[in-house]
């Protein structure tokens, strides 16, 4: 009898230990993100609060993100693709539909950032952060007010112009300058954009990316095409620099939170997305990263100077002229690549 009791006691102890271990075991979600795209300490706080571990992996652009998501090497649970990549992933059936009952904070997002053409009704995505591509200029070197893409072609600024070394962005700038749609695939319009970029090169224009900061701070370049986060941060730190969104409009991009198809941790992924949609989380991301927030409450927490800065939160008439990138199919992409090759050669 004692032997039976002893065995039964050991069985209970082992069972209790197994249950305890299972309870303490953390769910792990894989988060595919851009580098420096989340507020410091935010993931640690989420892990502590929800007992869910976040394994963060970084990529540099949408194409690299697509490769990661489709390679089959890692099953990601949450990712942050840009607008046109969201559209592509949806069209290929690579995203899970969101259960918004598990993401109640989505109702606090600004309506102006919802129901976009790349995901009508936000069935598969919710906005995480947004921004524009505009112009930064040195007010000590340029006395006039800059307000148009045409200023990037002004002969007065010969040897002072900087353009992002990005096929889609540079061609998009030229299309907006000429009054054409940002996503045009029309042969005539693309040919005109190519001619405009070649003319711009004759003004001593240089192409680059990260070096724009140093060139603008030092005064080696007086006017540049730049991402709004970098532009607004530089303008905040250096009084002689100013960031604007041109009157013709620009690329209005939205990085969105999505759940890749095949996740085994959908509930945990939605918990994480809901956490990132909280006011405090959204505010901290906007303050640290420098881009504008799609969260209404977080926006209202920002300094009045930020809220009233047209480079950050644009006037409605300029906002209405802004466009998001659309996904280009292989044939359309080849047209852009041909234009870009001829511009850069």
Predicted regions and their residues:
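Short, low-complexity disordered leader/linker segments with a strong preference
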Residues: 1-29
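Early extracytoplasmic/lumenal segment of secretory-pathway proteins
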Residues: 22-89
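A ligand-binding cleft/hinge motif common to bilobed small-molecule-binding domains
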Residues: 85-88, 217, 223-240
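A bilobed periplasmic-binding-protein/Venus flytrap-type ligand-binding module shared by bacterial periplasmic
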Residues: 134-141, 176-179, 253-266, 284-288
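Periplasmic-binding protein-like
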Residues: 190-199, 238-261
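Mature extracytoplasmic/periplasmic domains
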Residues: 260-320
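Conserved C-terminal helix/tail region of periplasmic/extracytoplasmic solute-binding proteins
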Residues: 316-345
């Amino acid at each position: 009898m004692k032997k039976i009791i002893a065995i039964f006691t050991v069985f209970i102890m082992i069972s209790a230990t197994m249950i305890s271990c299972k309870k303490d075991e953390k769910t792990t979600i894989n988060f595919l993100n851009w580098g420096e795209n989340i507020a410091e300490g935010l993931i640690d706080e989420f892990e502590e609060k929800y007992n869910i571990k976040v394994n963060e992996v970084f990529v540099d652009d949408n194409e690299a993100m697509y490769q990661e998501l489709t390679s089959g090497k890692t099953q990601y649970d949450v990712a942050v693709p840009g607008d046109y990549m969201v559209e592509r992933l949806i069209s290929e059936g690579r995203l899970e539909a969101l259960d918004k009952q598990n993401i109640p904070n989505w109702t606090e997002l600004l309506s102006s950032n919802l129901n976009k053409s790349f995901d009508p009704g936000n069935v598969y995505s919710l906005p995480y952060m947004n921004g524009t591509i505009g112009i930064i200029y040195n007010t000590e070197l340029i006395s006039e007010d800059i307000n148009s893409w045409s200023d990037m072609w002004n002969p007065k600024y010969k040897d002072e112009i900087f353009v992002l070394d990005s096929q889609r962005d540079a061609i998009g700038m030229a299309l907006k300058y000429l009054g054409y749609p940002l996503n045009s695939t029309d042969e005539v319009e693309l040919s005109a954009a190519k001619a405009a970029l070649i003319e711009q090169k004759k003004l001593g224009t240089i192409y680059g990316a990260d070096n724009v900061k140093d060139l603008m701070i030092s005064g080696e370049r007086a006017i540049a095409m730049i991402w709004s986060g970098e532009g607004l941060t530089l303008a905040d730190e250096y009084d002689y620099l100013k960031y604007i969104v041109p009157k013709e409009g620009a690329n209005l991009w939205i990085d969105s939170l999505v759940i890749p198809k095949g996740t085994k941790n959908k509930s945990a992924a939605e918990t994480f997305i809901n956490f990132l949609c909280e006011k405090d989380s959204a505010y901290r991301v906007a303050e640290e990263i420098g881009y504008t927030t799609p969260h209404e409450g977080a926006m209202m927490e920002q300094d009045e100077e930020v809220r009233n800065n047209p480079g950050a939160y644009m006037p409605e008439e300029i906002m209405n002229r802004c466009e998001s990138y659309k996904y280009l199919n292989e044939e359309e992409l080849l047209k852009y690549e041909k234009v870009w090759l001829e511009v850069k050669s």
